[in-house]
From Swiss-Prot:
This is CheY-P phosphatase CheC. It comes from Bacillus subtilis (strain 168). Forms a complex with CheD. The lineage of its organism: Bacteria, Bacillati, Bacillota, Bacilli, Bacillales. The gene is cheC. Belongs to the CheC family. Its EC number is 3.-.-.-.
Amino acid sequence: MSIFNGIKEEQMDILREVGNIGAGHSASAMAQLLNRKIDMEVPFAKLLSFDELVDFFGGADVPVASIFLRMEGDLTGSMFFIMPFFQAEQFIRELIGNPDFDIEDLGEDHMSSSALHELGNILAGSYLTALADLTKLQLYPSVPEVSLDMFGAVISEGLMELSQVGEHAIVVDTSIFDQSHQQELKAHMFMLPDYDSFEKLFVALGASL
């Protein structure tokens, strides 16, 4: 029997609430970073298959900015924070104070790359802290890696590992709202627990697997 048969909507609701708790911590950290009021929320958390994941993002050929890191500790897995080019470009322009920044220059501009690294540290650290508090598991993120590529290429490595548990990923939608500039930034977090960690995570959340 698939381990996913025992996962109920309640467990996904818990992951969404964990996301909202983490979003509160992230908003405070980003407000300090940008020196203005930031609101964040997590509209939903879903468990999606590979095909659904690609459709959800609009196709494998969509160019994206990706922040990749590993979840380590009692659970292991891959985490991706993925944004369309224009959203990442908008965030970096705000953070480095350069309205002319072009996302294509990311690899040549240390300051802009550092901005996305910091975003990854904030989002992953806040989410994993909230998840660890709820499950009583020890969790922490690795150092983030930033890349620009097509969506399908970005997640292919993580999905190859995930194929052992049925090609499903946890999607946590994140909405970041800049009150001062009335701007919204959408970031999608894809969490791909390793084979041994997927069941452990949902058991910790109360699923009967």
